[in-house]
């Protein structure tokens, strides 16, 4: 078959096009998935039109391989591209068709900045606040925004979004500012942004949700400071939805393009029961391909990063119906209305409406 030494090189080193053989089988994919670069990008930038896929391919392997609209596949391949993945899930689409799209809801997003703005979020950012006089350049922030307010996959497309760029790239070229713990600096940058949003709320800006899709507090040894500022923001009517708040009630789940079933990512397998006890949030659609204006990428192993903006978006939809709803009440309603433990946006909105109407009658 293949030279095992070449496999080892593939798993441990940088992936290059010449490492992709003319004949691709499942065994090769298993080794390729050991490569960090391949796990992140897969075939997203590959021309495979002259390659041949041979043998049987297990869905559990195929769904881990990322690809994009730039990928050129041969006619026969084990990947089933689904154009429905350019859209929100049917439950969210149903809410949008009923005219609930986040009008009047103010959301702040604190994340890695980006230079290129994909068409998915073009015109969707009301305010972009740069950090240290320039923009960061990373795919994370643009994908978070796409899930939140994107034209095709966004949960709450009409919300007013202010983006706070923490620009960690700046410190890569200024290592003297970092010290011994880069994560501590990262946490401090986020904390400073939360204080900034709090002060703006005191001045009447009325941000209702802050979306932070990356872990930070424990790594930066600022747990007490974050707990304090989050509580102060709550006093102004603003809820911070980060990995800590998200994981109290929710977890992330993938959708298999080949058969429409749900599955947990590899990193969740060690705590299967824990994740299945939470309300599951599907977040494995096509997302903007980093560096491209109009191309999209499929990723089969999702994370909290992508599910947090979906929950923030659904909470925003619920706030449009009942502006006094707390995040804790929203989470309880999400559990009560879930379908087979999977979050159901239309069910949430119906329940929020029902509860609001009943409270008015009392």
Predicted regions and their residues:
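Protease zymogen maturation seam
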Residues: 2-103, 119
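Substrate-binding/access-modulating region of protease and related hydrolase catalytic domains
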Residues: 2-15, 102, 167-255, 297-309
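Subtilisin-like serine protease catalytic core
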Residues: 93-107, 112-126, 132-187, 205-206, ...
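Sec/Tat-exported extracytoplasmic proteins
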Residues: 99, 113-118, 122-125, 148-152, ...
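Extracellular S/T/G-rich loop segment that most often corresponds to the catalytic His/Ser-adjacent loop
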Residues: 111, 236-320, 324
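Active-site/binding-pocket entry motifs
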Residues: 115-116, 154, 167-170, 216, ...
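Terminal peptide-recognition signature
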Residues: 144, 210, 314
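C-terminal subdomain of the subtilisin-like protease fold in secreted/lumenal serine endopeptidases
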Residues: 204-211, 320-362
């Amino acid at each position: 078959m293949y030279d095992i030494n070449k496999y080892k090189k593939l798993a441990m080193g940088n992936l290059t096009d010449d490492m992709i053989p003319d004949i691709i089988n499942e065994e090769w994919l298993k080794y390729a998935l050991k490569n960090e670069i391949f796990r992140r990008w897969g075939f997203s930038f590959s021309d495979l039109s002259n390659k041949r896929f041979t043998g049987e391919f297990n869905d559990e392997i195929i769904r881990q391989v990322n690809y994009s609209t730039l990928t050129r596949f041969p006619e026969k391949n084990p990947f089933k591209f689904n154009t429905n993945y350019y859209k929100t899930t049917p439950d969210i689409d149903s809410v949008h068709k009923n005219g609930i799209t986040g009008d009047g809801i103010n959301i702040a997003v604190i994340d890695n900045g980006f230079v290129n703005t994909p068409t998915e979020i073009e015109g969707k950012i009301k305010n972009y606040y740069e950090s240290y006089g320039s923009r960061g350049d990373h795919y994370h922030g643009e994908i978070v925004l796409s899930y939140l307010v994107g034209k095709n996959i966004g949960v709450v497309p009409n919300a007013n979004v202010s983006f706070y760029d923490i620009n960690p790239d700046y410190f890569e070229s200024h290592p003297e500012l970092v010290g011994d713990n880069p994560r501590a600096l990262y946490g401090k940058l986020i904390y400073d942004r939360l204080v900034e949003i709090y002060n703006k709320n005191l001045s009447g800006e009325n941000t209702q949700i802050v979306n932070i899709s990356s872990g930070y507090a424990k790594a930066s040894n600022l747990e007490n400071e974050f707990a304090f500022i989050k509580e102060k923001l709550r006093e102004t009517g603003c809820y911070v939805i980060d990995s800590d708040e998200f994981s109290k009630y929710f977890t992330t789940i993938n959708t298999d393009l080949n058969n429409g079933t749900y599955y947990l990512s590899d990193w969740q397998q060690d705590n299967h029961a824990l994740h299945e006890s939470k309300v599951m949030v599907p977040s494995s659609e096509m997302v903007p391909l980093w560096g491209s204006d109009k191309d999209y990428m499929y990723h089969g192993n999702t994370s909290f990063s992508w599910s947090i903006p979906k929950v923030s978006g659904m909470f925003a939809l619920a706030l449009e119906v009942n502006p006094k709803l707390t995040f804790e009440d929203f989470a309880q309603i999400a559990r009560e209305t879930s379908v087979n433990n999977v979050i159901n946006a239309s069910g949430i909105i119906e329940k929020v409406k029902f509860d609001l109407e009943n409270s008015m009658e009392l």
